[in-house]
């Protein structure tokens, strides 16, 4: 699943390609992906001009001024821009014909992606219902509320971080990296962490997600940015996908366990419970 760095990289690519472009027509081959009114999606979007490309957590936001599309890529979603003919592909599901003759295509092997067409005034309420936490920046991700939330939760730290309520954007790759960097075992109950460990988790969340953005995201399986380029963050991963390899910090073997149904990578020496 694309995580915050990958979605931010897609946003930046789409911004370069789409800003100022007007939708002339569209085709939707998988109506179930449209989570708001299907008829409104088809009838209200033609004539709309893309004024901004924004992001909230793992959600992309196409901003038309009064209207917005909130797009969630889920497991395998990606956007492709074709300047002339669109090739046949059974995994191409949404087609936006643009005023310069190009076509923006949404591709999704799993068909899990979602689209919500909303009035911009509904955006805040939408994300409030999602209980989405703050963005992982020094300005928005404050330590004191984070510490307070951890102290009041007996959940294991990894599943808790993946809920998106404490901070937006962490997924399976980056949470493993954050907890390795913070020297915290993923199964540790949040309220059993020392305050020093809580602070390390907080600070490493910001540092690693920002590094992921700087490196254009991680190309692990099928991820590409909107320009068709691979990310490079996979070259900087310390623990994710490194089962059986030596820990970069202590040379113990990285192991993989199951936690909450997810493959979880850790160093048993550096990340003791």
Curated annotation (Swiss-Prot):
Which keywords label this protein? DNA damage, DNA repair, DNA-binding, Glycosidase, Hydrolase, Lyase, Metal-binding, Multifunctional enzyme, Zinc, Zinc-finger
Domain of life, source organism: Bacteria
**What InterPro entries does the record tag this protein with?**
DNA_glyclase/AP_lyase_DNA-bd, DNA_glyclase_Znf_dom_DNA_BS, Formamido-pyr_DNA_Glyclase, FPG_cat, MutM-like_N-ter, Ribosomal_uS13-like_H2TH, Znf_DNA_glyclase/AP_lyase, Znf_FPG/IleRS
Give the EC number(s) listed in the UniProt record. 3.2.2.23, 4.2.99.18
User: One GO BP annotation here?
Assistant: base-excision repair
Cofactor binding: number and manner: Binds 1 zinc ion per subunit.
Tell me the SUPFAM superfamilies matching this sequence: Glucocorticoid receptor-like (DNA-binding domain) (SSF57716), N-terminal domain of MutM-like DNA repair proteins (SSF81624), S13-like H2TH domain (SSF46946)
Query: What PROSITE patterns does the record point to?
Result: FPG_CAT, ZF_FPG_1, ZF_FPG_2
Residues annotated as binding DNA: 91, 110
Q: Where is the active site?
A: 2 (schiff-base intermediate with dna), 3 (proton donor), 58 (proton donor), 262 (proton donor)
Q: Name one GO molecular function term.
A: 8-oxo-7,8-dihydroguanine DNA N-glycosylase activity
| Cofactors, names only | Zn(2+)
**Gene3D superfamilies referenced in this protein's UniProt entry, alphabetically:** 1.10.8.50, MutM-like, N-terminal
- Catalytic reaction equation(s): Hydrolysis of DNA containing ring-opened 7-methylguanine residues, releasing 2,6-diamino-4-hydroxy-5-(N-methyl)formamidopyrimidine; 2'-deoxyribonucleotide-(2'-deoxyribose 5'-phosphate)-2'-deoxyribonucleotide-DNA = a 3'-end 2'-deoxyribonucleotide-(2,3-dehydro-2,3-deoxyribose 5'-phosphate)-DNA + a 5'-end 5'-phospho-2'-deoxyribonucleoside-DNA + H(+)
Role played? Involved in base excision repair of DNA damaged by oxidation or by mutagenic agents. Acts as a DNA glycosylase that recognizes and removes damaged bases. Has a preference for oxidized purines, such as 7,8-dihydro-8-oxoguanine (8-oxoG). Has AP (apurinic/apyrimidinic) lyase activity and introduces nicks in the DNA strand. Cleaves the DNA backbone by beta-delta elimination to generate a single-strand break at the site of the removed base with both 3'- and 5'-phosphates.
Give the UniProt family note: Belongs to the FPG family.
| Official protein name in the record | Formamidopyrimidine-DNA glycosylase
Q: Which lineage do the record's taxonomy fields give for this organism?
A: Bacteria, Bacillati, Bacillota, Bacilli, Lactobacillales
């Amino acid at each position: 699943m694309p995580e915050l760095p990958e979605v931010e990289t897609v946003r930046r690519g789409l911004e370069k390609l789409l800003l100022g472009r007007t939708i002339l027509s569209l085709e939707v081959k998988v109506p179930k992906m449209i989570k708001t009114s299907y008829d409104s999606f088809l009838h209200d979007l033609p004539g709309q001009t893309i004024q901004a490309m924004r992001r909230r957590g793992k959600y992309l936001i196409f901003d038309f001024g009064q209207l917005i599309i909130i797009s969630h890529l889920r497991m395998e979603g990606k956007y492709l821009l074709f300047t002339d003919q669109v090739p046949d592909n059974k995994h191409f599901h949404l087609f936006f014909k643009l005023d310069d003759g190009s076509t923006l295509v949404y591709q999704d092997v799993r068909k899990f992606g979602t689209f919500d067409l909303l009035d911009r005034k509904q955006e805040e309420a939408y994300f409030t219902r999602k209980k989405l936490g703050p963005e992982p920046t020094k300005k928005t991700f404050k330590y004191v509320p984070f510490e307070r939330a951890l102290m009041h939760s007996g959940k294991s730290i990894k599943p808790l971080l993946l809920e998106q309520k404490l901070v937006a954007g962490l997924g399976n790759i980056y949470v493993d990296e954050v907890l390795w960097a913070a020297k915290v075992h993923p199964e540790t109950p949040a309220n059993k962490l020392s305050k020093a460990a809580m602070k390390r988790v907080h600070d490493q969340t910001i540092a690693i997600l920002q590094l992921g953005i700087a490196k254009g995201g991680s190309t692990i399986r099928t991820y590409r940015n909107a320009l068709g380029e691979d990310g490079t963050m996979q070259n900087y991963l310390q623990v994710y996908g490194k089962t059986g390899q030596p820990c970069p910090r202590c040379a113990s073997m990285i192991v993989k366990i199951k936690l909450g149904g997810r493959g979880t990578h850790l160093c048993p020496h550096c990340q003791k419970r």
